[in-house]
């Protein structure tokens, strides 16, 4: 870790905090699913790191779209719990949100969650899993316990988390692969479009 020169921030990743503070949004959150609501995600909605929604655990599962500033666009995200207890096995607890599993254009994230995403582009699933495995590793857990004496996992500390060289190389490879796939898809679409015009 100490020889690492790259961080999540330097690699273009962003960690933000869920925008839905429930006691300030009581009139917006509900358990009723209507055409004017979208999923409200809590850490309890993750089982074995996978999103399960809706789920009955005593918390409202939907939020109204009346206040768009509280919502985020659907994308590939790593969710990180902001607070952990000293009794928990790991300091960092994560979950995954996959864009293709979300039926809505937007979602709400409860304020006790951080979410990790790319600043300039959407993370690929491979990128997501590489970073997720790294954050969930024993190595990262030990680093956080040594460098952070409290049980809060804040966005700034995550942004400054050193990225080991092997993880950095994996991420660069995943990005390159995604870029090549995107170029191929765009070229294929262009060819198909040109053929359609010529027919």
What are these regions (language model features)?
Residues 2-197:
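Polybasic, glycine- and aromatic-enriched phosphate-binding surface used to engage nucleic acids
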């Amino acid at each position: 870790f100490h020889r690492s020169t790259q961080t999540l921030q330097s690699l273009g990743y962003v960690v933000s905090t869920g925008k839905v503070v429930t006691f300030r949004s009581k009139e917006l959150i509900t358990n009723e699913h209507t055409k004017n609501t979208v999923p409200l995600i809590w850490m309890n909605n993750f089982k074995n790191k996978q999103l399960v929604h809706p789920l009955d655990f005593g918390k409202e599962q939907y939020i109204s779209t009346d206040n768009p500033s509280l919502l985020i666009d659907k994308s590939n995200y790593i969710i990180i719990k902001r607070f952990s207890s000293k009794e928990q096995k790991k300091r960092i607890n994560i979950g995954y949100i996959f864009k293709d599993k979300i039926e809505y254009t937007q979602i709400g994230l409860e304020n006790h969650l951080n979410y990790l995403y790319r600043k300039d582009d959407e993370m690929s699933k491979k990128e997501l899993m590489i970073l997720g495995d790294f954050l969930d590793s024993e190595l990262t857990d030990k680093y956080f316990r040594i460098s952070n004496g409290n049980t809060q996992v804040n966005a700034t500390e995550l942004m400054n988390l050193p990225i080991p060289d092997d993880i950095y190389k994996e991420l660069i490879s995943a990005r390159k692969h995604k870029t090549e796939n995107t170029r191929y898809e765009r070229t294929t679409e262009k060819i198909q479009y040109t053929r359609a015009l010529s027919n």
